[in-house]
């Protein structure tokens, strides 16, 4: 199973740790980088402003993604050094440093390292560490968002294998990028270690800077009458600016911004196959069924006639950005009439909404609200507390068996922005749900209630398309513990 969760779920065995960090010369090259007029992508702008605000308030920002897996043998430090530098030099998402003009949060300045050969990551031996020390090390040695080198790499050596990890600020990567890092590092290192070649020969990948330029060019062409803008305006009106959030209390995170994850099994292998069959029969795909179940679960707590939600969509352009590391994922709106719907009706509506919303992925909601002007006065863009429901079919990842064999996982730092996010993942032999939330008693109780409703929604999707309401409500409001919950 591909792992997804909190850093506490990462269990590297004890061993000597080597970490690759930017050399002093590379950091100097970033500080002296040429100022660029290219505006960062909207995804980056949101994250940079959140980092600036958190820093000004003296708070920590949830930001780090730890990508880790196992590799056989004794790590060849020379080969790994060449691999890491080749990876960083060929992905220009790593080549930019951002700061704010005279401390003003409205003006983001990009400084560029024009010559990738100036980037040099060098290994440092940190000695033997146990599991907890390794996790702390991976988090604390990676610089903050507003520093250029907010990405580090490392290995933990064992008797017959080693653990590789990348600790990267979300500024530079999204969920898909985690898999790209795996393929880049794993395959390049294996080639160098086995061939004895001195340098990695890495093919060219598309520029993330080019993506940002295309994004802003597209946004500049939008007008109030653009269909995508009108769709965002309609969604904002329908929600009255009360953007989708978790339907139950989670407490305030201003005092305690610790975060955690839970993972539960939704369906076993047979149940997963049956769920797909039910979705097909309803005229939907698996993704539509997933969103329908999320709508049904939320309905138990809100009672609203229509579900409004956000889901993630990858904006990479096929054959252009498919292998590019960067933050491409964006949120799109989902609308599902749910009050009197059967599962089949809800699944069809969710699928249609998802398919229609894909065109909105390239249109930042911030720009739509700007164009709407007085029509939506007083409505602000979604905050970090907006809830996302994401679906991933891990079976469709190229060479998915390699992920399984290597124990691949993606882990987040143990911080929270106060919101709740949900990932529903189809594994080789089951379907799981992973949910992130503030680490406090109120949020934990609410998450247990929500997951109970979600589990029952999936169960009744495969067993019956009617009569789910009473049973889901009964389970959602019970004090029963959840089976199969893992941290």
Question: What does each of the following model-derived ranges do?
Answer:
Residues 1-56, 82-126, 204-259, 481-487:
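Short amphipathic alpha-helices and their capping loops
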Residues 24-40, 59-79, 145-166, 251-316, ...:
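Gly/Ser/Thr-rich phosphate-binding loops and adjoining beta-strand/alpha-helix segments
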Residues 97-98, 189-206, 233-244, 446-487:
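A short N-terminal helical cap/helix-turn-helix that marks the beginning
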């Amino acid at each position: 199973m591909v792992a997804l969760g909190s850093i506490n779920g990462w269990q590297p065995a004890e061993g000597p740790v080597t970490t690759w960090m930017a050399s002093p010369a590379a950091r100097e090259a970033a500080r002296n980088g040429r100022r660029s007029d290219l505006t960062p992508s909207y995804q980056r702008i949101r994250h940079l402003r959140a980092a600036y605000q958190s820093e000004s308030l003296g708070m920590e920002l949830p930001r780090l993604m730890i990508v880790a897996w196992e590799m056989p043998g004794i790590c060849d430090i020379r080969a790994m050094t060449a691999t890491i530098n080749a990876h960083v030099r060929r992905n220009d998402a790593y080549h930019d440093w951002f700061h704010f003009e005279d401390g003003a949060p409205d003006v983001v300045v990009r400084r560029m390292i024009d010559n990738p050969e100036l980037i040099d990551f060098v290994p440092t031996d940190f000695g033997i560490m146990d599991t907890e020390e390794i996790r702390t090390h991976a988090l604390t040695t990676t610089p903050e968002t507003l520093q250029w080198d907010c990405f580090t790499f490392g290995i933990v050596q064992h008797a017959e294998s080693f653990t590789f990890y990348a600790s990267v600020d979300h500024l530079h990567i999204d969920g898909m990028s985690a898999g790209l890092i795996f393929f880049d590092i794993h395959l390049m290192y294996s080639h160098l270690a086995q061939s004895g070649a001195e340098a990695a020969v890495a093919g060219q990948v598309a520029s993330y800077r080019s993506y940002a330029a295309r994004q802003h060019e597209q946004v500049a062409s939008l007008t109030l009458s653009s269909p995508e803008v009108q769709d965002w305006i309609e969604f904002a009106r329908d929600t009255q600016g009360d953007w989708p959030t978790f339907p139950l209390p989670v407490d305030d995170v201003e005092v305690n911004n610790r975060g955690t994850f839970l993972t539960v099994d939704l369906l076993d292998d047979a149940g997963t196959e049956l769920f797909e069959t039910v979705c097909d029969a309803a005229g939907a795909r698996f993704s539509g069924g997933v969103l329908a179940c999320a709508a049904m679960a939320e309905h138990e707590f809100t009672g609203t006639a229509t579900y409004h939600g956000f889901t993630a969509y990858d904006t990479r352009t096929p054959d252009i950005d498919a292998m590019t590391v960067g933050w491409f994922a964006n949120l799109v709106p989902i609308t599902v009439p749910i009050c009197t719907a059967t599962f089949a009706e809800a699944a069809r509506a969710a699928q249609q909404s998802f398919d229609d919303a894909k065109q909105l992925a390239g249109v930042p909601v911030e720009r739509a609200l700007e164009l709407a002007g007085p029509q939506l006065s007083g409505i602000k863009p979604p905050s970090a507390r907006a809830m996302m429901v994401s679906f991933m079919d891990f079976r469709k990842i190229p060479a998915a068996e390699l992920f399984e064999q290597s124990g691949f996982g993606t882990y987040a730092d143990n911080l929270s922005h106060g919101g709740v996010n949900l990932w529903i993942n189809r594994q080789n032999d089951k379907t799981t749900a992973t949910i992130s939330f503030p680490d406090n008693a109120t949020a934990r109780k609410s998450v247990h209630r929500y997951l109970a409703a979600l589990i029952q929604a999936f169960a009744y999707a495969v067993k019956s398309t009617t009569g789910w309401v009473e049973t889901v409500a009964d389970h959602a409001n019970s004090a029963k513990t959840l089976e199969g919950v893992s941290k």
